[in-house]
Amino acid sequence: MLKNLFRKTKYITVSQKNIENYKRENTPTIPDGMWVKCNKCGEILYQNDLEKNYMVCNLCGNHFRIGVKERIKYLFDKDTFKEWDYKIKTENPLDFKGYDEKIEHIKEKTNLSEAVTTGKCKIAGMEVVVCIMDSKFMMGSMGSVVGEKITRAIERAIGLRLPVIIFTASGGARMQEGILSLMQMAKVSSALAKLDEEGLLYICVLTDPTTGGVTASFAMLGDIILAEPDALIGFAGKRVIEQTINEKLPEDFQKSEFLLEHGFIDKIVPRSDLRKVLAKLINMHQNSF
């Protein structure tokens, strides 16, 4: 009996490689991109359901940032969008180090030519000129090409006697182009002044984020200014302002709800209602075109 008590215990050696193989074989395979975490409430959302709901969380109403393709799909009549000026090439006028390489990398990554896409389309059968900014392209920053494309679109709208809708999503002027990027603020604003003189409608839809030079120029010049819920809209950053004035700002400062309350915008429109609201506004102003 004592002999059996001190006998060496038998065991099986399992290598780390065998454990990894077991885990790999017994772990369910889930394709990438099927599930998305809401950055507001933390809920895990099924990608297909999220897309059907206009990229809006069905629990907390958080509006995910969307790009050009999604806006065209959700808002405009099918197969009516005709893009303009997509061949305009971004230059490096200041020979800013690494700028050319960065632009080419972002072009490949996003499949976009620049931070704004312009063109003509139809909403509920009515023709409009649209400019759609995309924050995925260098945070939607406004450089020479962005200003030129928006200006050309406005000038064409004047010639065609069509209303203009601009969807803003930008971090402001593009620092790599220096004063040339800041000049676009005046350039686009001047084109919008001509549009106004012609009695044509300009609707601006502010989306998250709309900041810097874009906010300080054409984003706030709309005849009608709409915004998506909970969108960040401002000029300088909240912390910069707090440090400058030595005061604590409200929690919802620079949010679309705060701007509506203080009279800076006309209406907050959920993404699911935006097509209907835009169609109604354009239809109301048809006689002025």
UniProtKB/Swiss-Prot annotation:
Catalytic activity as recorded in UniProt: N(6)-carboxybiotinyl-L-lysyl-[protein] + acetyl-CoA = N(6)-biotinyl-L-lysyl-[protein] + malonyl-CoA
EC number(s) in its UniProt entry? 2.1.3.15
Name one cellular component (GO) term.
Answer: acetyl-CoA carboxylase complex
Q: Which InterPro entries match?
A: AcCoA_carboxyl_beta (IPR034733), Acetyl_CoA_COase_Trfase_b_su (IPR000438), ClpP/crotonase-like_dom_sf (IPR029045), COA_CT_N (IPR011762), Znf-ACC (IPR041010)
> Where do the annotations place Zn(2+) binding?
38, 41, 57, 60
Instruction: List required co-factors.
Output: Zn(2+)
Cofactor, free-text remark: Binds 1 zinc ion per subunit.
> Which locations, inside or outside the cell, does it occupy?
Cytoplasm
Entry's Gene Ontology molecular function annotations: acetyl-CoA carboxylase activity; ATP binding; carboxyl- or carbamoyltransferase activity; zinc ion binding
GO BP term, pick one: mycolic acid biosynthetic process
Q: How does it assemble?
A: Acetyl-CoA carboxylase is a heterohexamer composed of biotin carboxyl carrier protein (AccB), biotin carboxylase (AccC) and two subunits each of ACCase subunit alpha (AccA) and ACCase subunit beta (AccD).
Q: Give the protein's recorded name.
A: Acetyl-coenzyme A carboxylase carboxyl transferase subunit beta
The taxonomy runs: Bacteria, Bacillati, Bacillota, Clostridia, Eubacteriales
Record gene name: accD
